[in-house]
């Protein structure tokens, strides 16, 4: 799916909060597209880079004085009842398929049950994951089946016209745009 169509698709899926995953070549703009959609919709945006996270980053057990252990939820999780996080937004798990199997199990619970350790995520939040394709040999692991089955997967296709539009919108110098349009293979070999 091309970038412009993918942006519109995410916008159309936002009202129903369908969990999606975007896969594509390394550096192809997957996360940037999600950021731009959140900005265009005027909603909150939280991004977590999965290769740098541990299971403990999703909550720590602590005794609460009642002979039971409770979870201290992470500051970034948009759970119901929080006033310091917008009511609507996109929670993006970047490079999700570089996460360990244990982290993917936690993510599956967030995607399926829309909660973390029993605390429900705000109803206005959508979960989007991004990641590289295994065929690109960019460190992508196999995604667990029970996680993959709970999301819609879109593959971002790289097109020169999409890149050119992005470059113009982001102030890339015309000489660079002209050079890349002349030597397109250089752009595609980097992405």
Regions found by a protein language model. Give the residues of each.
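AAA+ P-loop NTPase catalytic core and its hallmark functional loops
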Residues: 1-182
């Amino acid at each position: 799916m091309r970038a412009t169509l993918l942006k519109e698709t995410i916008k159309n899926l936002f009202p129903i909060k369908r969990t999606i995953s975007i896969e594509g070549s390394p550096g192809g703009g997957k996360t940037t597209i999600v950021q731009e959609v959140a900005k265009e919709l005027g909603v909150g945006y939280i991004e977590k880079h999965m290769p740098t996270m541990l299971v403990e980053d999703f909550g720590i057990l602590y005794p609460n004085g009642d002979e039971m252990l409770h979870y201290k939820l992470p500051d970034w999780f948009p759970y119901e009842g929080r006033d310091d996080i917008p009511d609507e937004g996109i929670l993006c798990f970047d490079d999700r398929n570089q996460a360990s199997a244990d982290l993917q199990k936690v993510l599956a619970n967030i995607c399926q049950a829309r909660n973390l350790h029993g605390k429900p995520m705000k109803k206005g939040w959508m979960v989007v994951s991004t990641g590289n394709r295994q065929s690109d040999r960019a460190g992508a692991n196999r995604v667990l089946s029970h996680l993959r089955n709970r999301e819609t997967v879109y593959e971002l296709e790289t097109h020169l016209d999409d890149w050119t539009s992005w470059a113009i919108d982001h102030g890339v110098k015309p000489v660079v745009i002209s050079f890349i349009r002349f030597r397109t293979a250089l752009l595609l070999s980097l992405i």
